[in-house]
Design a protein with these regions (language model features):
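Gly/Ala-rich beta-loop-alpha elbow adjacent to hydrolase catalytic centers
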Residues: 2
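Patatin-like phospholipase
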Residues: 7-173
């Protein structure tokens, strides 16, 4: 949820707009199971084994893209540098990714990378959503929710300069 809020705030959404967006949101409409198992519940679990996720995540990414487009935001180049940083986990290399900064390590132009894709990577709950695959020079890298490796990444904003305090909330039981 933090990545979604951070992205929408960076895109220029106001509190009232965010309230309206999330009030009208029906999460079940963003869950897109693989087409061949829609009517056969048992096969959904086979897909978990085969594709590493119950849901594809394409509808979620499409929803992000549509909402961001209303503010004219499509890729990281549409935002001022440093405005948005998202965290994702590269399971293939056991590394935490800070997006867009670390995309250059995969040979990807940071400014042209879709924010909706980065957001999908950052909130892709393992085994619930299929992972996103990023290609590097050696192989495809499996990328999932940043919370796998760093669930509370306030350190991203610590640049050594004195700034306003950053307020974060961590919910746990």
């Amino acid at each position: 949820a933090g990545a979604i809020l951070a992205t929408f705030i960076a895109a220029g959404f106001k509190a009232k707009e965010l309230e309206e967006i999330f009030d009208e949101l029906d999460l079940t409409k963003l869950l897109d199971p693989p087409k061949f198992v829609v009517n056969i519940p048992f096969l959904k679990w086979l897909n978990l084994y085969k594709r590493n996720g119950l849901y594809r995540g394409k509808l979620l990414e499409k929803w992000f893209k549509q909402k961001l487009a209303t503010k004219g935001i499509y890729c990281f180049g549409d935002l001022p540098k440093g405005t948005l940083k998202l965290v994702a986990s590269d399971l293939s290399n056991g590394k935490l990714l800070v997006l867009p900064d670390d995309l250059k390590n995969y040979g990807i132009d940071c400014d042209r990378f879709p924010i909706s894709r980065a957001l999908r990577m950052s909130c892709g709950l393992p085994f619930f959503f299929e992972p996103v695959y990023l290609k590097n020079s050696k192989h495809d890298c499996v990328v999932v929710d940043g919370g796998v490796l760093s669930n509370f990444p306030l350190w991203i904003y610590d640049n050594g300069h004195k700034m306003r305090p950053v307020l974060g909330m961590k919910l746990s039981s």
